[in-house]
Amino acid sequence: MWKGFLCCLLVAGVTSLQEWDPNRQYVYKVESRAFTALHQISNQYAGILMRAKLIIQPKTREELHAQLVEVEHSQINKELPSGWDQEIEIHDWQQLSALKDAFAIILQNGHIVNVKVKDSTPNWAVNILKGILSTLQVNTQADNLVRHRYNILPNASTDSAVYSIRETTITGECEVEYDVSPLPALPLLQHPELAPLSNVNDNVIDIEKTQNFSNCKRRPAVHYGLAGIPDLEPGQNQMGDFLARSSVSRVVISGTLNKFTVQSSVTTNQVVMSPEMYNSQKGLIVSRVNVTIKDIEEARPIPLPGNLQDTGDLLYSYNNAHDIEPLQRDRQDSDFTLESDSSSSSSSSSSDENSWSRDSHSRISEENKKAQIKQQRIKANRHSDDDVTNDEISFASRERQRRSRTRRSIRNDDSSSSSSSSEEDYQPRPLRGQPPNIPLLPFFVGNRGNAAFLLSSDDPAEIVKSLAEEIKSDMKKPAYIPERSTHAKLMMMRDIVRTMTAKQLQKATSLIHSESKHDLGWIAYRDMVSESGTHPALEELSIWIISKKLSSEEGAELLATLPRAVIMPTPEYFEAFNKLVMDKRVRNQPIVNSTGLLALATLHRQVHDAEFSHNNYPVHAFGRMVPRNYNATNDFIDYLGKQLHAAMADGNRPKIQVIIRALGNTGNKRILNYLEPYLERKKNATEFERLLMVTSLDILAEINPELARQVLYNVYINIGENHELRCASVILLMRTQPPAAMLQRMAEFSNIDPVKQVVSAVQSAIRSAANLKEPGNLNLARAARSAVNILNPMSMDIAYSNDILSSNMIQDMDLGYKDNMAHVGSSDSIIPNTILRKFNRYAGGQAHSDINFSEMVSSVKQLLKALRNPLKQREDPLLRREPVADRREFNIPPIIIDIAPPLEGNMMLRWLGNDRFFSYDKNDIKQLFRNYNAAALPLADMHMLDDMKVYNQKSLAIAFPNALGLPSLFTIDVPTVLRANSTFRLLLNNTSSESSSIEVLPWKLGARSETSLTYSVKEMSKIAIVTPFNSMEHMAALERNILINIPIKLDVDFDLEAQNIALNMKLIGKDSNPRLAQLSTNTYTTNHKITIIKPAIQDEEANEIHVRPARMMRDTFGKLQTGIALNLEIETEDEFLDMEFVRQELQGRDFTSALAFIWARRTINNHNVTLSIDEDQSTTNAVRIEGKYASKINDVDAGTWTEWRSSRVERSAKRHHRPRPEAQEYDSSANPAIVDRADKLEEFLNRASGNRVHGLAVRVAFTGSSDATFDLTAALGLSNVNGSARALVSYISQPAHPADVMPRKTEYDLFAALSMPAPPIINFNQALEFDPDSNLDAGLSIFTNDKPSGNLRIKGELQQSEERRNAIRSTPAALACMREMANGNNNLLPSCRNATEMANRLDRIRLQAKFENLSDDLINNTYKAYTWIRYFTQPYVTENIAQEQNPGRLNINVDVNNDGTALNASVDTALMSITWTNIRLNRWTRSLVEPSPQDTALDRLAREALPLYYEPTCVLDVSQAATFDNTTYPLTLSSAWHMMLQYQPKRSQDDENLDDVPDIIRPPVAILARETSNRRKEILMNLDHTIVAFKPTSEVNVEVNGRILIIEQSRTTDIMAEGNLVLQIHRLPSRAVYMVAPQHKLLMIHDGKRVLLQASNGYRDEVRGLCGTFDGEPTTDFTTPSNCILNDPKAFINSYRLGGDREDNAWMLNYRAQPCVSRNFTSTDIIGKHMPRNPASRGFELPHPVNDTSSSSSSSSESSSSSSSSSSESASNSDLHNNSTSSSSSSSSSSSESAEGAPEKSSRKTSPPQTSTLHRTMVVEEVTEICFSMRPLPECAPRFKPADTLKKKIKFHCLTKGPTASHWLKMVKKGVNPDFSKKREHKQLEVDIPAKCVRH
């Protein structure tokens, strides 16, 4: 039955042919068009139309003869109002004679399988023929069926069907969906062109064909630069969110599905894309081929040429760019074949293989004949033989030889492979020194199918030289770069360089290279060679570097470009790159060598990252870039690994960092083999190097997140690891998209993790990840939300480690970003020692990494010390005198010196489009300053700098053939130019009296320069169609420009000692009205000639695309203020240009996305915004800025405030002799032009009385024909004894004015006095009872030309409401404080300090203002400001209009609610009342609107950011103490002195004399405490030989160096030493002593029983004592002088006891009895090992069996299962340890040892598995000690005995007999195996080890 059915199908297949009558010929009319446009902006199209007649004469059933006649073409560039398919009247048709020759069509089962053409027919013509014939490819019988459930197969009885088949057309061998249905007569009547030769009674069938590009076996396309788009298949129906592609054919046939005639066939191919990948307005490439039958005539012979050649099926064939010989496409070695290609192909037949072999042989044997044809073809192209260089001819010859060798190799090596000939046809891979043969791109196919200048008389080297000269000329006027299309010229240069051979590049170099480093033409050529990314370019770059044509920095910059720019990283490319990096001459240039290593490592990663390589390189045209098993990458990693070990041995720290980063850049799992011994502490490395190893796993985390996640999690979970490594692991772990279960484990662990740095990192990471919005991170966001409520709720200081993830999506624009900002907190500084930043932008579904920054340093404090003065010999703090200088003697405990880590650091950043990495150590910093010192004197002479950098921020291209067989392409380039042209000299005074030393910052610095800085970027988006026969590129383009141009003359004088700065600036340049900035957009269509080197936008045919008539707006500003007239010109086609337009454009954007997508617009249209200087209207041309800062410390008491006000009024009145309002408290001067600004600042400092006064004077003067001056003088006085502050501000404005107009001078004099009491700050109860209400008094006087013109007086009260006070009592902090006070009279613990601070905050503000004679301008500006406030607070504001009353008065009331979460405000004016209700407050705004007499607004903001470490505080309260790191413990002090704080500076490993440093030191700063009667505390301080004693009696008395001080509440007592302020002391209202030591940055409050000490963060990690270690971790606070960490607070206190009663040794016994726990880090297995799954084989003891029978059975089964599990485990972990061997099974049971009397199945159920061998710690008891084996040893399990033994020497750890040894002995007997592996080895003993165990 089945045989009969198959026979029927075969008969049907044979007869299912188009009804070709051999006696007739068929005449078809061919009409085709291909257009490109930004069609959703405007119906303006550019493109080509073609028409012809196709005559087909059948010869046999398998062969047709055909000819195209009357072939004509025409191009258009105009608007088509009705769209691309409207009828177009064309008058200038041109002949296309290359298509006139007859050809043959070979059929197989009715399908076109080959087209034979004349051998001289160019390849582009063949593709056009195939495009026309593709419309006639019809499969009505469902051959090559693609199985689908919805298929309805055709049959002879019906004319309808739905099915999918695989079919070959010009655009690919793809799945094609057929929809077949009868076509009724009515549509034919309406559209007779569908079937012109059909009759009314004919059976007409309509066939709709839809090509599915997402399911293709062969798909001609080329692409690059598409990395970052997940799940992309270039050329498919949809690519990302930016491009969609479709191809639909409508075929109308008459007859039946068995025999039919094609009446008409129309194929329409459309590509719709976003020009910038994100736009809602799209662009279009459309092509259509319409073949309609015109006549069926009597057959007339169509003579075929005699020299026909096969061109294959209808698939588009690639051109040969570098040879006029038709391209013979290679079938690549299977190692280069894409997996998708080989997997989708079927096995080849032997006949195909033989045919391939014959073709190869025949091509080789006809070389001479083809050489003759080549000569003829050159003449046919109207070029002589001389036009083809010898280099090109030799290249073609070598290419043919290579093809022959390749084919022979494949035929011989792969003849047995079923897939050898089924792989995709690929372009030939470029030979060494030859450019790639990239298909479909204009400069490779634009000249009659060849490279643009292959057949041209123009030499590419000469053309490149000409472009370099043009660019050089353009750069002379950088402000006009956009108009001159310099960026387009740069891209043309790059494209031409891509087509050039190595010899051509060498010639171009000889023509362009200049010995001058400032030749801009050479610089442009230099950068474009690196941007071209070809093998010849790399060879040329290598020559430049080795021959030192480039400086080291230039060479490094170009090498860093290569991973981004390379277009085909083939094995030959890697070989050349590797040869360059390994060259000795390059290794002698460290910066070049290190950058080259990093770039090469990055390139290895990019090629081996399957998704990146597939999307970024033209793999569908060339196959894989490197073979599947490319050993060069492994060899490179092995080389880096060896270099790492060697550098570790040499101690070359910068080199170590470079190698670690290079290993990380590879992103290969094999790097773990080299990092593992260091990460697991099996080999020595510094903690910083281990940290760098972890952060270098960032690439691995992206490429292999599962593997990286396992490693990073193992680092994180080890609480014995360094916190920096653990935090870095958390940061990278979040980049691996961890699942919800893992995040929940981390969140739960944060509740028990003892390290706060790590807890903070986990908290911030999970909380921020829960708010991610970017679609690619929705799974992470969901997982984080599942864990966020499990987190430790503790609030963390931002000084701790943080990992902040944020994202945003602008949905309607398909734009977004993901930002990861993280830092790892430092233990020795508030500044983080590691900062990581990764910022990705998303556009159209493509992710692009814009920022990849990291900054790491081993020790922030060590770095700051090195930067202060690396060469100057500083006083060694160890040489200072002993700290206690009075007559007492104390036994100060010796403190073991902590050794600071060696200074190491690095920075990685993306600079000028490239990733750069800089590493350093202390020697590098010293060398940096030596170089600075050496360069200081030469820089005093005038120097010239004229440099430029050109780079391409983004390069993207995708191209494929359209329905006409012509290349269609979409490209984006973003060329960027950064130019600096400067002449400068530096005037330095940086040497001290000692000629051998320098200062980091000179005391005086001067600079004189004339500089022109230019930044110009152009985004170039192009949608184009290439017609190779006339070298035209029909395009629609979008270009956006950003230009910033600053030509300026700058003189700077800086005096550090006098704190003065002066700047003189003047715009320079030869251009009139110099342009400063420009932002523009241009859209246009054009038909561009490829071989004419000219920017497309400059074509005569270039037509701008206009949406609507442009509007011009021009405004000049600044003329009346500064005298410099700035012109703002706006030309735009936007419909609206107002605030609503701005709001709509910013809709959906947060601040980050607004900056990241600054030029992204929702609509596309032409606009131009230009900012320039109008020199004709400007009256000034230079500006001088002068600034001076001054400060003063006064001895002022509280009563001075009244005296200051009254005396000030008198002095003001006497000096001015003019009437002033009573509110005016300050008069600037009668003649400001005479009084020097320095004198005025000094006067302000004297009048703004306070303990601390800060002053600032700034003057901005514009000079020219009419001067303009603006003077600001301000002073702020602050009190040390209360919260009062006083401010004076004077602002004098004298704008520019015409010569015939009197100058107008306006003066604003402001005074403000805030009077605040001194509140209780160490007693919460007193704070609740205290009245903190404060007063504000302020006034503003305005003078115009020295005459009063208005004044304003404000009086106000700042209050605390009774409701707020009552609410504070019930807050958690207040309740906790009350409990602490009740339990131990403790007032200074953290909860009480927080409660006291809340009790001093004010929640009510009442202001009354009176004003008169204010100018209308000031009133109008005030109202405008109010309208802005009203706009942004619209939901909260209400207005009530009232009758005018109380004119000249204004009342402002502000009330904050009790929780500080919202405020109400009201403003009452004469005309209206305005009310704001429930304006929400966050913690930052709350700090601003709730003033407090205890601190300033800046203090409150800083405390919100750094609640723990803004003012690090240590407290000794009555019965409890709190450390700097917030550890609270019970406190009991004896009468002996205890060390409260001891400054303990670390010694650096970099110090040369480290070996000479003693193990203990006596520090220069120490604070001692002891208890006297009534739990009072006496304090003794040593501050660099200044001894301060605090002695509590009835009140605390203070002695300084034995002298008793008189301390008052109303003023400070200042202690000076050597002209420096050492101490400031005063009493608080509670009579407690308040002391500040500004030089030592210490603050202390002492009330007799309690001591509060605040120290700056400069003491971090360098103190010891009762205040803890101050390293950020409470777990280390109880560190003793011997660096042991205790758990008992009493023992900890005793460890810092300084002696006392010699008879009382109980405290010492208590201290010594405590176990010493060191701060050493522990290591764990970070990277999984090959371990057997059997627990017993891993050293665990399993439960004993119940009976012998089950034991025997389980032993047998376990033996086999252990072996299999071991092997499977080995396989599962093979990606972690490729070079490791799996552990063998420890089971020695044979398979014959099975159970007796019980079935195997039941034994598995009743007994657990058992092994014959166990691992246990061996114990050897001796006379005085017990010894334990350091590792568990094998021994026979119960019921087993040794069959044989071996003697081995085993390491033992021994303990003296006693409690400890007995404890461990008991544990071993219980079956526990203690870990003695890290203990000290005491002896080796020879013991018997069982070799095999057998049953008893």
Curated annotation (Swiss-Prot):
| Basic residues biased stretches | 400-409
- SMART domains in alphabetical order: DUF1943, LPD_N, VWD
Gene Ontology MF terms in the entry: lipid transporter activity; nutrient reservoir activity
Domain Vitellogenin as annotated: residue spans: 20-835
Which sites carry carbohydrate?
A: 155, 212, 290, 593, 631, 684, 852, 981, 989-990, 1168, 1282, 1394, 1413, 1420, 1464, 1526, 1720, 1747, 1778-1779
> Quick one: a GO cellular component term?
extracellular region
Enumerate composition-biased segments (Polar residues).
1805-1815
Q: Where is the composition biased (Basic and acidic residues)?
A: 325-334, 355-370
| Disulfide bonds, paired cysteine numbers | C1514-C1667
Location of the region described as Disordered in the Swiss-Prot/TrEMBL record: 325-437, 1209-1231, 1727-1816
> What residue ranges are annotated as transmembrane?
none
Q: Where is the composition biased (Low complexity)?
A: 335-354, 1750-1794
PANTHER family (UniProt xref):
VITELLOGENIN 1-RELATED, VITELLOGENIN-RELATED
What does the UniProt function comment say about this protein? Precursor of the egg-yolk proteins that are sources of nutrients during embryonic development.
* Protein name in the entry: Vitellogenin-1
The organism encoding this protein is Periplaneta americana
Lineage, uppermost ranks? Eukaryota, Metazoa, Ecdysozoa, Arthropoda, Hexapoda
* Annotated gene: VG2
